[in-house]
Amino acid sequence: CGTTGVIVSAHTSLCAAPIYENGTPEQKAKYLPKLCSGEWLGAFGLTEPGAGTDAQGQQTIAKEDGDYWVLNGSKIFITNAGFADVFIVIAVTDNVLDKRGRPTKLCSAFIVERTDPGFSVGKAEDKMGIRGSSTCELIFEDCRIPKDRMLGVRGKGFQLAMATLDGGRIGIASQALGIAEGALEETIAYVK
């Protein structure tokens, strides 16, 4: 079923894979066993209202506060959000000047847990298809996460996100092809 494919693809390629590929040994030990066993479900938060996946349009920010990162902002259209336990989230951590002296935003990736203070899942989307898959917004209101939950290198979150999406596209393309083949087979059987 299409829904199962989307849930599993988002879970494995968009949440577990970036932890496997970029996580510290401690992050891998904490998250991968529960994600791989299915005890925990994962999601990936990049898309924002008014910005989509444009790195320079990102409004979700993460500021250092002692031993914590404090996240503020929101994400939309997040697959698995209604039921996920772990989220990979992209947020702006640095505003710098590029080589030409223009202001630019550097994003970083973070591991957010459903129970983190200041984090909540917003409204569910009323979708036309793949309705069994939960798609919701993520809300960060002074969401405090320990500093050791940064995933990968500071300021390289956009690169991490793009590499992650490359892997996710394979799963979604495979699903689309399978659904199209199934629809064609059913159509041929019907018209005979």
Predicted features along the sequence, with ranges:
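Short Gly/Pro-enriched turn/cap motifs at secondary-structure boundaries
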Residues: 50-53, 77-80, 100-102, 127-134
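A structural signal for short hydrophobic beta-strand segments in well-ordered beta-sheet cores
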Residues: 60-63
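A short, Trp-centered hydrophobic/proline-enriched beta-strand micro-motif
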Residues: 38-46
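Internal helix-loop-helix
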Residues: 1-29, 33-39, 79-86
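Glycine-rich beta->alpha junctions and the first turn(s) of the following alpha-helix
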Residues: 119-192
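A short core secondary-structure module
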Residues: 72-121
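Cysteine-centered functional microenvironments
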Residues: 45-49, 72
